[in-house]
From Swiss-Prot:
The protein's name: C-type lectin 16
Originating organism: Aedes aegypti (Yellowfever mosquito)
Coiled-coil parts of chain: none
Subunit details: (Microbial infection) Interacts with non-structural protein 1 of dengue virus type 2. Interacts with envelope protein E of dengue virus type 2.
GO CC terms: extracellular region
Tissue: Female salivary gland (at protein level). Not detected in female carcass without salivary glands (at protein level). Not detected in male tissues (at protein level).
Residue intervals of the C-type lectin domain: 27-152
């Protein structure tokens, strides 16, 4: 049994997952798996479960995610960071939606972002930290960092 748990932990770490894995149901367009992953791991997790990393390409979709996130008990903390499906991995400074290949046109960047700090920030996350007046804004961060994420029905 201990060996099985160890092997599961090793396999999960190889694809960038930690914590318990929960699938999303079809009751909502968006969901927040109880999984922590890097950006690639988050995209893979959503895809393997028939979803995609969230494409927030309109104010309406952004508001839907904000409203749903505010109902998640785990997010009633001082700081929440969630991966979404945008990055500039293909071309620096040109943010695209990974799941669709379309350019990011709608955005809700924090003032002064994206900034590609130190040349390593290529993936986008939603950031909620009311003490810093950050209210579900976007920020570019290092893709290898671990955080929860938002999946969307594909």
């Amino acid at each position: 049994m201990a060996l099985s748990l160890y092997l599961i932990a090793v396999i999960c770490s190889l694809v960038g997952f930690t914590a318990s894995q929960q699938t999303c149901d079809n009751d909502n367009r968006f969901c927040f798996p109880n999984v922590v992953a890097n950006w690639i791991g988050a995209a893979e997790y959503c895809s393997r479960n028939g979803w995609r990393l969230a494409v927030l390409d309109s104010e309406q979709k952004q508001q839907q995610v904000e409203e749903l996130a505010q109902r998640v008990d785990a997010f009633k903390t001082a700081k929440v960071e969630l991966w979404i499906g945008a990055s500039d991995l293909a071309r620096e400074g040109k943010f695209m939606w990974h799941p669709t290949g379309l350019d990011v046109s709608y955005s809700k960047w924090i003032a002064g972002m994206p900034d590609n700090k130190d040349g390593y920030e290529h993936c986008v996350h939603l950031w909620y930290e009311p003490s810093r007046l950050i209210n579900w804004h976007w920020n570019d961060v290092v893709c290898a960092s671990m955080r929860r994420f938002v999946c969307e029905q594909a």
